[in-house]
């Protein structure tokens, strides 16, 4: 996979506008937007860890997930991504770093599974998530709700910071235009849109070059060199999950190596 040969210049001139500094006064929109920007400012240049456990395993409990979060923060993580209302609530009791919360729902009525419902967004905020991750692809949500309508519903109810999980530059540009606060490459390779082998660092570079909001590199990061490359092309922060926090898949990887030898 080809990468850009030089770092991509980042444009975050949106920050002063969000803080309501233009015109010499603060309005309600500017204040709420500034607070959301602050959540991502805290994540700039560091590692976010996705704390998780395979469904149905003995470690799939809020107590374990929160202990896992506490451990990675002690090791230097500056943010946590976590699935599930109770997991988020438990994590917030243990760590002081920003938490990106989401709810995974696998529904028969929609291919969207990352925070597909408005109630999920509101409950995550109530549980303490400073940032809520949502599927920002152009697929329909339950009951035929478009992404545009979903964002409208969210902003009618809450000013919580929204991280848009996307699969393409087109989805990212739409998410930015609808007021999402940052973009993550989480869904690259997980929809019908073709993508190169993960991690999709090329997409990170394209997003960083074209967007005015932070870009979170996520999906398939297993090596330090990959993380460094993502930062080099313009990532605001990098989120790593399985390579750090999934002992089930890591154990399977080594066991399969033994069986295949």
Task: For the regions a language model picked out, list residue spans one by one.
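Glycine-rich phosphate-binding active-site loops on the catalytic face of alpha/beta enzymes
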Residues: 52-54, 107, 127-141, 183-194, ...
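Alpha/beta catalytic cores of nucleotide-metabolism and tRNA/nucleoside-modifying enzymes
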Residues: 3-6, 21, 26-38, 54-59, ...
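Hydrophobic faces of well-ordered beta-strands that scaffold small-molecule active sites
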Residues: 47-51, 80, 99-103, 132-134, ...
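Conserved, mostly hydrophobic/aromatic
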Residues: 72, 91, 183, 230, ...
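Conserved N-terminal beta1-alpha1 strand-loop-helix module at the mouth
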Residues: 18, 27-126, 162, 170-177
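Structural motif
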Residues: 75, 94, 127, 157, ...
């Amino acid at each position: 996979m080809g990468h850009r040969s030089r770092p991509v210049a980042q444009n975050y001139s949106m920050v002063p506008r969000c803080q309501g500094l233009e015109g010499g006064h603060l309005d309600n929109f500017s204040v709420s937007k500034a607070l959301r920007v602050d959540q991502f400012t805290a994540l700039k240049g560091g590692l976010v860890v996705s704390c998780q456990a395979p469904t149905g395993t003995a470690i799939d409990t809020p107590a374990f997930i929160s202990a896992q979060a506490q451990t990675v923060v002690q090791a230097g993580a500056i943010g946590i991504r976590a699935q599930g209302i109770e997991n988020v609530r438990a994590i917030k009791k243990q760590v002081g770093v920003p938490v990106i919360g989401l709810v995974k729902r696998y529904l028969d009525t929609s291919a969207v599974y990352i925070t597909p419902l408005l109630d999920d967004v509101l409950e995550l905020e109530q549980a303490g998530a400073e940032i809520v991750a949502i599927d920002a692809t152009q697929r329909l949500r339950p009951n035929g709700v478009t992404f545009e309508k979903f964002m409208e519903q969210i902003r009618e109810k809450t000013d919580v910071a929204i991280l848009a999980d996307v699969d393409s530059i087109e989805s990212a540009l739409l998410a930015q235009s609808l007021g999402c606060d940052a973009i993550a490459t989480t869904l690259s390779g997980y929809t019908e849109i073709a993508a190169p082998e993960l991690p999709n660092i090329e997409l990170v570079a394209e997003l960083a070059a074209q967007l005015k909001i932070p870009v979170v590199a996520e999906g398939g990061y297993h090596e330090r060199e990959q993380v460094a490359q993502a930062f080099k092309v313009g990532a605001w922060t990098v989120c790593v999950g399985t390579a750090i926090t999934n002992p089930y898949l890591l154990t399977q990887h080594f066991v399969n190596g033994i069986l295949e030898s």
